[in-house]
Amino acid sequence: EWCGTNSDCGEGECCTGGSFNRH
């Protein structure tokens, strides 16, 4: 699953600085 903005983060392992990271 992917997220694109910090507001998408909830697990503490995604989206830092608006970057795309898996979580």
UniProtKB/Swiss-Prot annotation:
- What keywords sit in the KW lines? Secreted
According to the UniProt record, one GO cellular component term is: extracellular region
Keyword NADP annotated: no
Expression sites by tissue: Expressed by the venom gland.
- The source's superkingdom equals Eukaryota
Q: Where in the cell is it found?
A: Secreted
**UniProt keyword Secreted present:** yes
Main location group: secreted
**Family per UniProt?**
Belongs to the u-CNTX family.
Output this protein's name: U22-ctenitoxin-Co1a
Native species: Ctenus ornatus (Brazilian spider)
